[in-house]
Amino acid sequence: QRPLSASWTVTGSGAFLVGKKKSRVRISGVTIGKIVDYGLKDSQNMGACMAPAACDTILQNLMDFGRGEKDYDRIITGDLGYVGQSILFDLLRKKGLDIKENHMDCGMTIFDQQTQHTNSGGSGCGCAAITLAAYIMPQLISGEWKRILFVPTGALMSTVSFNEGESVPGIAHGIVLEHC
């Protein structure tokens, strides 16, 4: 039986063109993340492994741009899932931030947990890509959302590192997208 912390791989892809022509959505800032390793070794709980990196990137973005969490319509993580989201909230709360009102996680959005029984939610790079393409970008294009912080998350592991019992570090980069 799969643990409740396990996630389901999302099969999908997304591609975006970045150019000089004026568009209805622009990239107005980027925060390069760093590898964060809390020493967790459970590959069935990648949300917990990635949450510290997401926390670090969100905090760094807010500091770099002189913003607060309310300056974004949404702060969107890639695939932390239900378990990782809870850890992210705890880590941010310890730093004095509360993003519960405007946080969204692609791994939690992509599936219906009640009817599809997906444990912690969806995972994988396709999860963030298709949610950005099919759900987030239309919100920005229409102007329903004016500014978001998109923080896709990643777990750095391989079959070799797993078999050797290594920890699973996380990484997350931040992209500020704005309606224009």
Language-model features, listed with the residues they occupy:
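Condensing-enzyme catalytic core mediating Claisen C-C bond formation in acyl metabolism
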Residues: Q1-L59, D64-R67, E101-M108, R147-T153, ...
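Active-site-proximal alpha-helical scaffold in enzymes
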Residues: W8, A15-K21, S123-G143
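General structural feature for long, well-ordered alpha-helical segments within catalytic domains
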Residues: S13, M50-T57, G68-D71, G84-L88, ...
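A short glycine-/small-residue-rich loop at the edge of a beta-strand within enzyme catalytic domains
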Residues: K41, N45-P52, I75, D79, ...
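Short glycine-rich phosphate-binding loop at a beta-alpha junction
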Residues: D71-G78, L149
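Short glycine/threonine-rich loop-to-helix capping motif typified by GTGT followed
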Residues: L80-K95, V160-S167
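Conserved catalytic cysteine-centered active-site region
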Residues: K94-T131
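Internal helix-turn-beta structural module
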Residues: A128-A129, A134-E164
